[in-house]
Structure formats: C-alpha cells, structure tokens
C-alpha cells in the first residue's frame, strides 16, 4: 500500500457531512477505503458523574481528544492498524470496548471540527466543508438526537440555542476558509459529489504511480 489519501469532510451539526462522507465511502468501496468519525474521539469522561457529563459542551474543540485522533491518523498513514474508541452518546462516555481499523488506501475523516486543528488539517489531501442553511441543520439535528440518541425535544432545542448555535458561529463556520471544496446542500449535491470523487480518484492514482516509481 502506498501513501493513503486522506479526505476531511467538515461542516456544522446536521449539515449533511455524514451523508457526504458515506456517499464517498460507497463510491470507493471497490478500492481500499475506511472512514473515521471525529465523534468517536470525544474525551473519556469516566472521572465525571453522569450529571457532570451531561453539562459538557460537546460542540467546543476542547471536547475532543485530538491528540489521540492525530496519533491514530498518523499510524494509519504509516500502514499501521489502530484501536478506535467507541463513544456512547446516551451515557456521554466511551465504551470499554474498541474497534480495530486497518490501514487503507483512502481514509475519510468526518467531523464538525476536523478543520479547526491545524495539525490534523495539514495531513489532509482534500479538505471539504459541507455548507447548509441553519434552519435545515437544526431540523435534522432534532430528528437525529431524538431518534438516535434518546434525547427529548426540549433538551435538543435548548442545547441548540445555548450551545450549538454559538459554537457553530465561533468555531465551526470560520473553518470554512480552510476548505478546498465547499459543498452546498450536502449529500443532495450530486454534481459536487461526482467532481469530488473524480478528484480523489486522480490523487489516489498519482500516489500509486509515485509509489511504483520509487
């Protein structure tokens, strides 16, 4: 295996970045591809009570263990397998078990704040920002948090107004300037997805040719 292609897919909560990342994953399944979610790298909170964990600001950069994420990305790019954490959103903490991720030719990194950390950003071959209207994002977040994370409507709306929206404006939206590609309307933008897939394929081919010549 040559040097992997690392694609970063960022964007606000509910922007459709996960849909974009999964679509790219689907398109490259014939090649060697893996996906890493930044959400898996929320910090371990075993030392906190359940009440204290619930008060954590999960939309702030400090909520993530970027040192571990960086180390794991570097290991994957060096051809080494990693043990990826598994995060349980219902108890706001990591699960005891981990999942092994093997090195692949294409690595898709997905998360709202992956472009905020310069160390991680500099590893990427292509930086993508999924840009979606705030009204659409909050509607998607409400559905997701209620159906997938066991939250109440009141708690989701309160968190959005007090935490999610301010953090988006302060930390997530500004990272758009680092993006090589900005995709409006997320996974529904077929033209952007097709162009991005073609570009990734070209980079992968170039890296494979370089490796063969070395």
Swiss-Prot record:
It catalyses: uridine + ATP = UMP + ADP + H(+); cytidine + ATP = CMP + ADP + H(+). GO terms for molecular function: ATP binding; cytidine kinase activity; uridine kinase activity. Its main location: cytoplasm. Pathway: Pyrimidine metabolism; CTP biosynthesis via salvage pathway; CTP from cytidine: step 1/3; Pyrimidine metabolism; UMP biosynthesis via salvage pathway; UMP from uridine: step 1/1. CDD domains: UMPK. It is found in: Cytoplasm. PANTHER family: URIDINE KINASE (PTHR10285). This is Uridine kinase. It comes from Brevibacillus brevis (strain 47 / JCM 6285 / NBRC 100599).
């Amino acid at each position: 295996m040559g040097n992997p292609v690392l694609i970063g897919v960022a964007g606000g909560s509910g922007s459709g970045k996960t849909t974009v990342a999964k679509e790219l994953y689907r398109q490259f399944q014939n090649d060697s591809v893996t996906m890493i979610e930044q959400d898996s790298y929320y910090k371990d909170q075993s030392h906190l009570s359940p009440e204290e964990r619930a008060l954590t600001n999960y939309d702030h950069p400090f909520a993530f263990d970027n040192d571990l994420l960086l180390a794991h990305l570097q290991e994957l790019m060096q051809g080494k397998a990693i043990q990826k954490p598994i995060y349980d959103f219902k108890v706001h903490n990591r699960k005891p078990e981990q999942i092994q991720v093997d090195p692949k030719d294409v690595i898709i990194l997905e998360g709202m704040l992956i472009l905020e950390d310069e160390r991680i950003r500099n590893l990427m071959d292509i930086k993508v920002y999924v840009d979606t209207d705030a009204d659409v994002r909050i509607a998607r977040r409400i559905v997701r948090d209620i159906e997938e994370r066991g939250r109440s409507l009141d708690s989701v709306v309160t968190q959005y107004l007090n935490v999610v929206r301010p953090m988006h404006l302060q930390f997530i939206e500004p990272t758009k300037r680092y993006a090589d590609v900005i995709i409006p309307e997320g996974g529904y933008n077929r033209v952007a997805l097709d162009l991005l897939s073609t570009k990734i394929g070209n980079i992968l081919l170039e890296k494979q040719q370089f490796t063969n010549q070395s």
